[in-house]
Amino acid sequence: ADAAAGGKVFNANCAACHASGGGQINGAKTLKKNALTANGKDTVEAIVAQVTNGKGAMPAFKGRLSDDQIQSVALYVLDKAEKGW
């Protein structure tokens, strides 16, 4: 798993709702560092769980993405959040 591969997965599967780390469906649920921290989603494990199982308006990606792809996208999201998107 690596962030570069995660970027490709993100662009293909996540960017429609989370372009540039935003939250197009729920503006309070962005992928910005402060929002990840406030929502307890600021670890690889927490993001992996969210992507795998979904929650609210976000669909589950279990079965659509491999475990390695989900791990990679989590690394990508954290890397981009640290850099301010």
Swiss-Prot record:
Keyword Metal-binding in annotation: yes
Record's comment on post-translational modification: Binds 1 heme c group covalently per subunit.
Gene Ontology terms: biological process: photosynthesis
Binding site for heme c: C14, C17, H18, M58
Primary residence: other
PANTHER family, sorted: CYTOCHROME C6, CHLOROPLASTIC (PTHR34688:SF2)
Subunit structure: Monomer.
Protein's name in the database: Cytochrome c6
Species of origin: Leptolyngbya boryana (Plectonema boryanum)
